[in-house]
């Protein structure tokens, strides 16, 4: 007799699971138009605000900020994906709310990425993956490395996004039966790099192993590599060519 029967989880039931996670995140505070603080969080409020007001509408990924006395090169050396997400939220919500939605978005995406990574080819939801993701983000043994809730609220949301996207990249590469899985996987891994470098360095050997092992044609693998380069080359080029100024 099986302890657990493999019963399909409906989309409605999935919503219930994620509502539990959302309740933990105190949406009543998220939608107050206030500025988040704590740890490095306050230091991220200013550059993202400057990005939205001076770069985003000009389709500019990085440039010179006039803040901090004589100014400094903004988003040449740090990762722009969270700023882009905040800009999109800011089209609808005030900046303070948009910033907080971006932050908690990284937490929900991390839970989802674990759940997706734990799925088998036949299932549409993994309760064990969901529990693993929820357990990870609620871990309190570290508060600054990134990935868990405590670190994210201390300003490490870039790291959290990077972990989530790396998980999704591997999940789509190994668990998806869609014809475009190599494309989706490359997009997610590109987003991971645009969020933070350290998780990419950790995940890269694992991703490369499954990328080589994947039963895709040479053309499909080549196209996925081009997509990854297309997404990341603008940021990585400016980073590498200006590295001497860090």
Question: What role is predicted for each listed range?
Answer:
Residues 1-246:
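Membrane-embedded transmembrane-helix bundle of lipid-linked glycan/lipid transferases
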């Amino acid at each position: 007799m099986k302890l657990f029967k493999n019963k399909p989880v409906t989309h409605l039931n999935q919503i219930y699971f994620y509502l539990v996670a959302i309740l933990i995140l105190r949406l009543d505070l998220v939608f107050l138009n206030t500025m988040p603080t704590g740890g490095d969080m306050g230091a991220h409020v200013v550059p993202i605000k400057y990005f939205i007001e001076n770069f985003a509408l000009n389709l500019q990924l990085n440039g010179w900020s006039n803040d901090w006395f004589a100014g400094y090169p903004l988003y040449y050396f740090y990762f722009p994906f969270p700023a882009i997400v905040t800009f999109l939220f800011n089209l609808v919500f005030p900046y303070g709310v948009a910033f907080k939605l971006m932050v908690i978005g990284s937490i929900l995406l991390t839970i989802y990425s674990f759940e997706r990574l734990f799925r088998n080819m036949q299932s549409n939801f993994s309760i064990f993956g969901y529990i693993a993701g929820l357990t990870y983000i609620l871990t309190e043994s570290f508060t600054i490395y990134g990935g868990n809730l405590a670190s994210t609220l201390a300003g490490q949301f870039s790291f959290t996004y990077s972990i989530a996207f790396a998980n999704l990249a591997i999940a789509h590469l190994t668990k998806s039966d869609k014809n475009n899985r190599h494309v989706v996987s490359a997009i997610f891994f590109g987003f991971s790099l645009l969020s933070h470098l350290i998780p990419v360095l950790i995940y890269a050997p694992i991703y490369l192993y499954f990328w080589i092992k994947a039963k895709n044609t040479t053309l499909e693998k080549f196209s996925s590599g081009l997509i990854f380069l297309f997404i990341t080359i603008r940021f990585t080029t400016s980073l590498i060519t200006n590295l001497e100024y860090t």
